[in-house]
Regions:
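Short, conserved beta-strand element in jelly-roll/cupin
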Residues: 68-80, 88, 95-100, 146-147
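Conserved short histidine dyad/triad with adjacent acidic residue
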Residues: 48-66, 76-90
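A short, N-terminal "cap"/entry segment at the start of jelly-roll beta-barrel domains
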Residues: 2-49, 57-60, 65
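Conserved metal-binding segment of the jelly-roll/cupin
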Residues: 113-132
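A short hydrophobic beta-strand segment most commonly corresponding to one strand
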Residues: 119-121, 137-150
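Short alpha-helix capping/helix-loop boundary micro-motifs
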Residues: 68, 104-109
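Short connector loops at helix/strand junctions that flank enzyme active sites
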Residues: 43-45, 65-69, 75-77, 97, ...
Length: 150
């Protein structure tokens, strides 16, 4: 897992061409004007999902992990807590669904506040819980870039 500000994205170019393309998209796109939906960047290798939602209490969140895609989660506006734990010590809540590339878990995690202009990268070995309210519920607009691992 990596959490940082977009202005430091150049530090992560060595993570591969697809991650680099993801950061280029974040820097070159007027993100505030993007409507919720799916945006193709490089076919099914790299695509973006824009969503707007209200953050929720931790009790309503689920730890999740993906096998085929890395998540580059960028907060366009608002702020949220993102939970994280290394994959391995959790109990499976819902088994892996290949069609959605998602598996749900329960277990220990730690939280970090991610605000507008910040990103989090979650790799397949990172269990994460996004969208959690840092206190009371608030509105968030977020772009998640899905980066194929192979």
């Amino acid at each position: 897992m990596i959490i940082d500000k977009l202005e430091n994205a150049h530090l992560y170019k060595n993570l591969g061409e697809r991650i680099s393309k993801s950061f280029d998209y974040l820097k070159q796109t007027n993100l505030k004007n993007l409507a919720p939906g799916k945006y193709e960047i490089d076919g099914e290798n790299i695509f973006a999902l824009v969503s707007e939602y209200k953050t929720k209490p931790e009790s309503e969140g689920k730890l999740e992990a993906h096998k085929k895609y890395i998540d580059v989660q960028y907060v366009i506006s608002g702020e949220e807590l993102m939970g994280y734990s290394p994959l391995g010590n959790q109990q499976i809540l819902e088994p892996y669904k290949e069609e959605n590339d998602i598996e749900f878990f329960e277990g220990d995690k730690s939280f970090t506040k991610v605000s507008a202009g910040m990103f989090a990268i979650f790799f397949p070995e990172d269990v994460h819980m996004p969208g959690i309210a840092p206190g009371k519920s608030s509105s968030v607009k977020k772009l998640v870039i899905k980066v194929r691992t192979n």
